[in-house]
Amino acid sequence: MNIRIHSFNVSCVGLCCVLGSFFAADAREVYPLNGSWDFSFNGKPAEKVTVPHTWNAEDAANGAQGKREDAKSVNSDAYRRGPAVYLRTLPVEPRPGKRYFIRGGGASIVSEVSVNGKPAGSHEGAFTAFCYEITPLLKKGSNTISVLVDNTQRNHIAPQRGDFSMFGGLYRPIELIETDGVCIDPLFYASPGVFITTKSLSKSKAEVEVKTLLNSDGKA
């Protein structure tokens, strides 16, 4: 994987045209993976849920803190903290010369993504996005995506206290991204890969700097 940074200045008048040409050249397709997933909390039998999803929609709001062992009970209304797994199987036909990434907007508190039983990446923190390249993990036909999410308290992950509960779940949108071999980098903190900074501003003129991260698979 090769990463290059391109930087240039443009006037406000030409900004839309320049950005339009960049995004057209990127030629990426985004396929939402929201919707029906199989979900299992703490080893319990799987059920169908709709992602984005949290398993604390009711128990975190009723004020029942409960011990963790109580939260393992099916009939308990205690605030549940622990591991859960989201599973989804989907047909994918990887195209030659294309690259594939999976991006999640947020999972609380830590998460691990696997594709066809092979690890794609892990993330800590409930409020930031994650993105991994999964090109070498995909196969033609049926592919199984697994997202392990755990909202167990961890002393090294903030926040530890607040006037809110730490909801567990895959609670923001998740998507599959297809790009060319050379693309605007989706892996830099799962950001858009395009950064715009105002350099000067007056009543008659505005100048901005556009920095773009390009990611190459090394074949181009």
Predicted regions, residues:
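Active-site region of glycoside hydrolase catalytic domains
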Residues: P186, I196-T197, E209
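Accessory carbohydrate-binding/adhesion or oligomerization-edge regions at the termini
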Residues: A25-D70, T144-D150, R154, F164, ...
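Short beta-strand segments of immunoglobulin-like
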Residues: V194-K203
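Surface-exposed, low-complexity/disordered Ser/Thr/Gly/Pro/Asn-rich loops and linkers
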Residues: E69-A78
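Bacterial N-terminal signal peptides that target proteins for export
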Residues: N2-V13
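Accessory beta-strand-rich segments of carbohydrate-active enzymes
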Residues: F39-N42, R81-P192, D217
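Bacterial N-terminal signal peptides
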Residues: S11-S21
